[in-house]
Every structure is written in C-alpha cells, then in structure tokens.
Amino acid sequence: MTGPSSNNKRVKLWFDAKISAGVVVGGSVIADTGAWADTMTPNNNVGWQLTSNVFKLGDAGSNTQYAQGSAILGGSHGGIGLPVFPTAIETGAIVIALTGSSYTAAAANDLVATWFEVSAMN
C-alpha cells in the first residue's frame, strides 16, 4: 500500500542483493515499478504488487539464471519487464531484497509491504 500522499515512489525487487550497512548496494533488479510519478499514474493510497520468476539457466554450477518481472501500480499493470540474467553463486546464500522509497520527498512510510512470498522448486 502507498501512503496518502502524492509523493513520487519507487519499489524494486532485488535478486542476489548485496547489502552494506542496511542499504542495498548491488545485485540484479528483477522487478521494478520504475519512477512512479503521481502525475502519470496515481499513487495516493493505492495498492501495488511486484512479481518475478527466476529460473536456472545453463549447466549445473554455471551460476546463471533468467528472471522476468512485472509491476502493478494501483489499477495499472506495467506489463512484463525485459529479461534479466543474474549470475548468483548457486552454492551459497542468495539474498532477495525488496526496497521502496519516496525518492523525491524522502518521506517515511510512503510505501508499505504487507507480505512477501518466495516459492522454490527443485
């Protein structure tokens, strides 16, 4: 859910996120709302959703993946994003992170994530 403001907002879903001092500093963005400007797509007190699928690509141990995501902003579906090809080390931990910001106003609580789900198959 977004806060009751018309501040510009942005949400990103990261795969193999690199985190330093509590801030995501690297990784692959696998779903992104883009610059969610209220004047283009209303973002005052509306719902949002990011989804992405990540698949193993290539031979075992090649550390190559394929990801594709989409975003829904209020009542507007952003379509399917371009493919992303992460290179996470598959024998270690892979960090998945969700970031949100009110990037022009820096207002706290302008974006709220109410749940986060990861499903895996082998």
PLM region spans:
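Surface-exposed molecular-recognition determinants
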Residues: 1-122
